Amino acid sequence: MSRAAICLLLAAAPAVPYAAILGYMTPPQPLTEARIASEAGAERAAWQAYLDRSRTLLEADKATLAAERAGGPYPDAAPHKGGAGGMPSNRPAAWYGTPEARHVADNILSFQTPAGGWGKNVDRTGPVRQRGQHYVSFDGGRESWNFVGTIDNNATITELRFLARVQAQLPGTEGQVYRAAFARGVRYLLNAQYPNGGFPQIYPLQGGYHDAITYNDDAFSNVVQLLREVAARQGDYAFVPEALAGESRAAAEKAIRVILATQIVAGGVRTGWCQQHDALTLAAVGARNFEPIALASNESARLLQLLMQLPDPSAEVVAAVDAGAAWLKRTALPVGNWARFYDVQTMQPVFGDRDRSIHDTIDEISEERRKGYGWFVTGPEKALKTYASWAAKRL
């Protein structure tokens, strides 16, 4: 074959995009006494008290279950159920006073941990928890303590919202048990909040990436939204005592401050947020092996939605929203969606794999991860539509 023919073949061949392993995800650090001593500064006492309380509650959770199991066999864990777990939020108000809804509420009460929270992925339409039965489903293994008390997958928040709807239909003494469980659940969230306003994914703390401030899957945003509604004492939350409402308001305000403090500045310009931020330093961190340090478009969009709901936003909030919306506009892909992750420096899409490798093209990661994770999202589109109206009101 002639040199000219080879050149023609090469010219006709489809272009192959440049692909490379950009690096490897470094697992985030848990919250420890050593880190508090070296990194907490003037807030050291508050952080140590937080860690001590977390450990005490964890020990109490485990001791309670162990006591129930002493001296005999115990039931298997409840089956796994994803989604809303049988706790619908869109039924007519009267439905929440029916026997069907009350059974769900009774299931919720029975699975509430001694610390006041709930695990995830339990079928709330199923039987109530039996003595000695685990607080979580088989999802993490028969004896696993993973996610015993969490805000992941909207756990705890969904249970609290459901209890509020049920008690609203039972204003007399028969609804008191649900109101008491609700108050314990809100107290759980208040206990879980870090001194700087952040929230971990799991509480009491279990270490690893779970200790990071978790924006992933809107966990943080969902907590703050609920706390703001509790603080307002309207509708289903009108029963909330004034003192608890005041604490919820203060917690929500503190959470807003940490949102503003964690917005990523790249090249002197505010952008979006990462899925997780270190509890102490607020620096961006990774999570699971395939979730690197990167700007997260969906989570950033949800945080912007939360900030835009604030009445009379401060100049700092307005600046954060303007910058975040501008970043989403700049990073939209030609097809009209967004990559889930963007490199903080280059603003190019990045993709992670289970071996912690970070890639610049989805084709380079394993088939299992390509098909088993949502690498492209559309959530920012809704946020930008909201932003257009929100910004117009300030003109």
Predicted stretch roles:
Residues 96-100, 150-161, 214-225, 247, ...:
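Aromatic- and histidine-enriched alpha-helix N-cap/loop-to-helix transition segments
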Residues 20-98, 229, 233-254, 280-287, ...:
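Terminal, non-catalytic domain-edge segments
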Residues 86-157:
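N-terminal carbohydrate-binding/catalytic regions of secreted carbohydrate-active enzymes
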Residues 104-117, 181-198, 249-268, 320-336:
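Long, well-ordered core segments of solenoidal/helical folds
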Residues 167, 175, 179-190, 203, ...:
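Eukaryote-skewed repeat-based solenoidal scaffolds used as protein-protein interaction platforms
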Residues 5-15:
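Bacterial N-terminal signal peptides
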Residues 62-65, 69-71, 118, 123-125, ...:
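Intrinsic, low-complexity N-terminal interaction/targeting segments
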Residues 111-114, 169-172, 195, 233-236, ...:
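Alpha-solenoid helical repeat scaffolds
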